[in-house]
Design a protein with these regions (language model features):
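Stable alpha-helical structural segments in soluble proteins, enriched in small hydrophobic residues
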Residues: 33, 74-86, 383-393, 397
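Short amphipathic alpha-helical coiled-coil/interface segments
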Residues: 26, 75-83, 259-266
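Positively charged, helix-rich recognition surfaces that bind polyanionic ligands
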Residues: 3-4, 17, 171-418
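Gly/serine-rich nucleotide phosphate-binding loop at the start of the catalytic core
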Residues: 1-74
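Acidic carboxylate diad motif detector
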Residues: 49-170, 313, 317
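Well-ordered beta-strand positions in beta-sheet-rich domains
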Residues: 4-8, 147-148, 164, 195
């Protein structure tokens, strides 16, 4: 089982120079190969320059030789994936008139493969190989006599088998890394009929129903506050920056480093919060002995809907795919499967209806936002949705289980520190 971990390391000026040069060489290699793909007919090549052709044809090129061999090949492979995506979009019309992969104006990340990484078990240090041409260039140009790159971080101690290391261009003596490592996949736990169902939403990010004790609880209430705060801050800074440019006679205002920094901060804050929420949920499932987690599948929920620009912004910002990925791998570490269930009419059917289907859907029962009323009894609408998702899954899979509705009225709100 492969996992990834994002971190950063402090590096010396010499290392910053070396890594920066490799990222520069990778961007130039990308552009050379991209130009060849765009103009292969004009260049009168014998065949279309795919990855297999380019990794051989450019072996002697200047920029290729500035990188470790597998790193250079991986750069060509990333370009190949980008072109394949372009052709798929063009064929399926996923995007109208898609543009081919662009040329890189800035330095790009480089990827070290397993053969270029030396790591001893339990050590907090990695040793990375450098190409012969790069070492010669650094000695002649900058007087840098490094034979290897050594990166230190305490997270490396718990990684027995590092498969890939993605290194981003250094900034201010720091370098961001994404480490992909392998862990032993745990055995799936035996099914015991104990389920947890999850209804995804905007105001209540995850509303959960535990089939064992009938408990319902809400996770992720802080997500919308984070989104709202950063949207307001971005809007405030943009208005000031664009007004300054307009006052100077600039017709088409450009973004600023400050705005880009806020966007990055927003992404990091949301990602960190999602990790904390999904980690709490995975730990809850482990402690309570839950054998299966059922989650509503809301992919394509936004298609063909006119919901207004405010709600549209919230829907499009909802990182449901990230949630699926984070929750799936965290549960997998405990041997618990994550099952996606189509959730049509789960929020409209009564918890007492014979089945969850269009026949028994009563949208009028949702009198207010967050409130479902049936037979004069008030229930939390999101809790009813989570309850019906589990009912629908049991019906589709041919399983039977008595479920309690006592916890649907007042779900507990779980606060996870931001």
């Amino acid at each position: 089982m492969l996992l990834s971990h994002r971190t950063s390391v402090n590096i010396r000026p010499e290392y910053s120079n070396i890594i920066g040069h490799m990222c520069y060489a990778a961007s130039k290699l990308w552009n050379v190969c991209n130009y060849e793909r765009r103009r292969y007919k004009e260049l009168e090549l014998e065949k279309y320059p795919d990855w297999y052709y380019q990794k051989k044809a450019h072996k002697g090129d200047l920029w290729y030789r500035q990188l470790p061999s597998q790193t250079a090949q991986e750069t060509c492979k990333q370009l190949d994936k980008a072109w394949k995506s372009f052709y798929v979009l063009k064929k399926t019309v996923g995007i109208k008139d898609p543009n081919p992969p662009r040329f890189k104006q800035d330095n790009i990340p480089i990827t070290y493969m397993q053969m270029g990484i030396q790591h001893e078990k339990g050590s907090d240090q990695l040793r990375l190989s450098l190409s012969k041409d790069l070492k010669s260039y650094m000695e002649e140009t900058y007087g840098i006599h490094e034979k290897f790159l050594y990166l230190e971080n305490k997270i490396f101690r718990n990684m027995d088998c590092i498969k890939q290391l993605r290194i981003y261009p250094p900034e201010d003596g720091k370098c961001d890394l994404i480490v992909i490592y392998e862990v032993k996949e745990p055995e799936p736990i035996s099914l015991n009929g104990h389920y947890l169902s999850i209804d995804l939403g905007i105001h209540n990010l995850m509303t959960c129903y535990d089939s064992g004790n009938g408990r319902t609880f809400i996770l992720g209430r802080k997500y919308l506050s984070l989104e709202r705060y950063f949207h307001k801050e971005i809007s405030r800074v943009q208005s000031i920056w664009y007004a300054q440019q307009s006052g100077n006679g600039i017709k088409y205002p450009r973004s600023s480093k400050h705005i880009k920094r806020i966007y990055r901060k927003k992404q990091d804050a949301v990602k960190d919060y999602l990790h904390k929420v999904t980690r709490w949920l995975a730990e809850y499932c482990r402690k309570e002995g839950i054998s299966s987690v059922i989650i509503g599948d809301i992919r394509n929920i936004r298609k063909g809907k006119e919901i207004g620009h405010k709600a549209n912004q919230k829907f499009h910002g909802l990182p449901y795919n990230k949630l699926y990925i984070m929750l799936e791998y965290k549960l997998k570490l405990y041997g618990i499967p994550l099952i996606k269930q189509e959730e049509s009419y789960t929020s409209q059917c009564s918890p007492f209806s014979p089945e969850v289907s269009k026949r028994y859907a009563e949208a009028s029962n949702r009198k207010e936002r967050g409130m479902y009323i049936t037979d004069g009894v008030r229930y939390n609408a999101d809790a009813v949705g989570a309850f019906n998702i589990l009912r629908k899954y049991l019906s589709v899979s041919g399983k039977q289980k008595e479920l309690s509705v006592t916890g649907l009225k007042n779900p507990e709100i779980i606060k996870v520190a931001v």
